[in-house]
Amino acid sequence: MELKATKITGLADHLFRHEAGKMVSVLTKIFGTENLETAEDVVQQTFIDALQVWKLKGIPDNPSGWLFRVAKNKAIDVIRRNKHSVQYNFGDDERLLLKSEYTLAPAMENLWKEEVIQDDLLRMMFACCHPDISEENQITLILKTLCGFSTAEIAKAFLTSDDTVSKRLYRTKEFFRQKK
């Protein structure tokens, strides 16, 4: 049983490093970069669910596909809960599709296609490299959000403290919230 849990945790770590950035990119397209923390929360909850479900039911045949499906469903839940909220600034192309229950599922399906995800990763990278954000903060956000590095790993690479990296991330996310 412990070997199975170790295997699942190792797989989840690997998938987080390789898939979380893609999920955050799509989710920030849906929710807007000013709601980056909402996107990260959805991704984190998706991985928590994966660890819990996979320990009970085993690893699915396509773990990445499972993660994307759960993240997509969680995003739909957030949209439904906040349908009338002005907090989420849906993109122009998605705004009408995501606000209608009839078009919500097909619109979400299109947003999670591989070629769209690649465009979203690039879009998110450009957003992280906004000229009003310092170079250190740009790199820190990209490493954390798109590459899946931990705060400790980033701190070690920058020869700085975890606290400094956390502050950089906070300031950058605050910039996006204010940019709304």
Which positions does each model-derived feature cover?
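Short amphipathic alpha helix immediately N-terminal
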Residues: 132-149
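Helix-turn-helix DNA-binding module
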Residues: 147-164
